[in-house]
Swiss-Prot record:
The lineage of its organism: Bacteria, Pseudomonadati, Pseudomonadota, Gammaproteobacteria, Pseudomonadales. GO terms for cellular component: cytosolic large ribosomal subunit. GO terms for biological process: translation. HAMAP family: Ribosomal_uL11. This is Large ribosomal subunit protein uL11. It comes from the Bacteria. Forms part of the ribosomal stalk which helps the ribosome interact with GTP-bound translation factors. The keyword Transcription does not apply. It comes from Azotobacter vinelandii (strain DJ / ATCC BAA-1303). The gene is rplK. Belongs to the universal ribosomal protein uL11 family. Keywords: Methylation, Ribonucleoprotein, Ribosomal protein, RNA-binding, rRNA-binding.
Length: 143
């Protein structure tokens, strides 16, 4: 018989830098999960990623206090800010532009995000990422 699911926990943890401090510790502790076991497993799985990039993770906690987790790709907004060399998006995106991204950068981000996007092909994924860039106040060249 399958294990009974107790909870789903959604967190954003920096790749390779999970530790028992907030937000990881309290979120897992209230469900009785072994926090250090999760931290070690998460850090091992994200070892190949660039350290420090926020990585969304969905943790499934079962009634016997065991868990499984699934990592997603880094949010598009973080990748766009990194590509444009800015620290935050515009507070007025339609009037005040804070940076520029080109087609090659958008394609690179779309390839990294394609598994998590619902886009049918790379071109649709590029358009989706370009829309995210515009909503952050970035100029988009070549799309």
């Amino acid at each position: 018989m399958a294990k009974k699911i107790q909870a789903y926990i959604k967190l954003q943890v920096k790749a390779g830098q999970a530790n028992p401090s907030p937000p990881v510790g309290p979120a897992l502790g209230q469900h009785g999960v072994n926090i250090m076991e999760f931290c070690k497993a998460f850090n091992a799985r994200t070892q190949g990623m660039e350290p420090g990039l926020p990585t969304p993770v969905i943790i499934t906690v079962y009634s016997d206090r065991s868990f499984t987790f699934e990592t997603k790709s880094t949010p598009a907004s973080v990748l766009l800010k990194k590509a444009a060399g800015i620290s935050s998006g515009s507070s007025r995106p339609n009037t005040q532009k804070v940076g520029t991204v080109n087609r090659a950068q958008l394609e690179e981000i779309a390839k990294a995000k394609q598994a998590d996007l619902t886009a049918a092909d790379l071109e649709a994924a590029v358009r989706t990422i370009a829309g995210s860039a515009r909503s952050m106040g970035l100029n988009v060249e070549g799309v």
